[in-house]
């Protein structure tokens, strides 16, 4: 939920409609949305409020990014660029971020609301106008924005980006939406006979196939019982719609957590190298700006830390491999941990562009490692062939496998609408090939860490099970023993083992999965 704002940009003033409230006489659906219950014409964008004023820059920025996302861009990459270009900072940047992310995340709820309020199917609403209405609906139903400000500003935005004719339509639909609370709209757009998963899909704005998959994942990873799974599923889906906290990592050898704390962050309770930023721009912290620290989810930190903690058998210096290193987040932490351990690290990435990003990330660590007589290298190769080309070379291997990202939906608002069940087949083949290659590349006594940012059973337990049952040269290690918090205590609620599954609604991290496999001698 975004913070309350002043009425000039949509805050709820004294006496305004409370969040989720409903004015007297409100009614959704039915008839021309531009006319009220006696046929009288409703408030129009063309009169009497057509004012000579500039469009709110925050809403215009959100709309600009939303249209870019519709064309295939990623919100988390596009938004920072637009904010910089439009010089939107501080509270205004926070408002823009919540408006954009919320409208994208919750379009599975807002779309049926818009269709009913408009009295027509979405296919008959221009895509550009629909995005404007999604932004408006989020202000009315998902943010602490005063009704008059939400309607006025959305109509003004429509007039600028969609045209005067569209502004009248947007005005009518917005006023119809404002007549009901979010709870009332849910009751109207979800049929009383809807199946539980269909109801949750609309209520929490997820495709129904994801709802079903997450229910199976909670049961399959033993995070829920038959008695608790429905409540746990609701909490998990709700966490996907909550803005995540900003987690930072101090890369060992290059920065200390204390430096991040001095810059305004709080020490992480989960990660010994982590911190949490409760406000402000991470890029304003010198260590982050200089690449000695970075934004990284605590779950990702725990994966790298677990691999570094597990005992291995090695003669002399250890050799570590990050098999799928791009764009470099985990590689940056692994590099620091390798420096701490006096080990060499090879970061492999199949994409040349992403390999360049990894080199940029590891530049400072590589220089420090070289000064201490060790190597941190970046190579560009297909991870599926490294096991054949370098059999038994590495002592610690991370397979941060490409996946659907269903455990990180809170950070990637558009991902839930782009992924389909068909993605699982192609990804599953790749995941199995990468894990098999990683095992081949591991020396006897070494360890492979297979990780995904998805709890989907087809990307986690099924992959590990299919690969390991075909070979007798690996044994599972209980990953739960290696995932410890900042004080060194075991992190609870990771499942029944030997793999470990983190959950957004339980641990506050992304939904990271980890399996640790030791190569037998």
Provide a role label for each language-model segment.
Residues 1-521:
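S-adenosylmethionine
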């Amino acid at each position: 939920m975004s913070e309350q704002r002043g009425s000039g940009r949509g805050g709820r003033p004294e006496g305004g409609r409370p969040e989720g409230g409903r004015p007297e006489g409100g009614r959704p659906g039915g008839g021309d949305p531009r006319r009220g219950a006696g046929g009288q014409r409703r408030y129009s964008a063309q009169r009497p409020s057509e004012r000579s004023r500039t469009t709110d820059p925050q809403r215009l920025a959100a709309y600009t990014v939303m249209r870019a996302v519709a064309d295939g861009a990623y919100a988390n990459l596009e938004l920072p660029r637009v904010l910089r270009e439009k010089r939107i900072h501080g509270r205004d940047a926070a408002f823009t971020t919540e408006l954009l992310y919320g409208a994208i995340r919750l379009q599975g709820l807002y779309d049926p609301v818009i269709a009913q309020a408009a009295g027509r199917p979405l296919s008959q609403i221009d895509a550009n106008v629909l995005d404007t209405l999604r932004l408006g609906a989020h202000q009315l139903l998902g943010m602490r924005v005063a009704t008059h400000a939400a309607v006025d500003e959305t109509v003004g935005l429509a007039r600028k980006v969609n045209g005067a004719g569209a502004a009248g339509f947007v005005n009518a639909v917005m006023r119809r939406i404002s007549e009901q609370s979010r709870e009332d709209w849910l009751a109207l757009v979800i049929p009383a006979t809807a199946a539980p998963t269909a109801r949750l899909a609309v209520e929490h704005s997820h495709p129904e196939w994801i709802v079903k998959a997450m229910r199976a994942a909670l049961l399959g990873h033993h995070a829920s019982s038959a008695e608790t799974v429905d409540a746990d599923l609701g909490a998990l889906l709700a966490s996907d719609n909550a803005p995540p906290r900003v987690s930072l990592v101090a890369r060992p050898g290059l920065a200390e957590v204390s430096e991040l704390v001095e810059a305004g962050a709080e020490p992480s309770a989960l990660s010994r190298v982590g911190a949490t930023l409760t406000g402000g721009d991470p890029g304003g912290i010198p260590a982050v700006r200089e690449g000695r620290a970075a934004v990284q989810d605590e779950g990702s930190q725990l994966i790298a830390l677990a691999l570094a903690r597990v005992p291995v058998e090695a003669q002399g210096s250890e050799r570590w491999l990050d098999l799928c290193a791009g764009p470099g987040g985990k590689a940056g932490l692994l590099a620091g941990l390798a420096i701490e351990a006096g080990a060499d690290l090879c970061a492999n990435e199949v994409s040349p562009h992403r390999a360049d990003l990894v080199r940029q990330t590891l530049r400072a660590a590589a220089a420090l490692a070289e000064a201490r007589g060790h190597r941190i290298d970046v190579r560009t190769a297909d991870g599926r062939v490294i096991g054949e080309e370098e059999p038994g070379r590495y002592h610690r291997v991370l397979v941060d496998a490409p996946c659907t990202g269903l455990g990180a939906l809170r950070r990637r608002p558009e991902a839930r609408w782009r992924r389909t069940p068909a993605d699982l087949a192609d990804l599953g083949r790749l995941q199995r090939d990468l894990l098999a290659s990683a095992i081949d590349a591991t020396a006897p006594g070494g360890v492979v860490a297979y990780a995904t940012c998805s709890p989907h059973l087809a990307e986690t337990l099924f992959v590990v099970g299919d690969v390991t049952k075909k070979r007798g040269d690996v044994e599972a290690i209980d990953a739960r023993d290696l995932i410890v918090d900042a004080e060194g205590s075991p992190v609870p609620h990771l499942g029944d083992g030997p793999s470990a599954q983190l959950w957004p609604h339980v641990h506050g991290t992304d939904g990271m999965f980890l399996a640790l496999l030791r190569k037998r001698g």
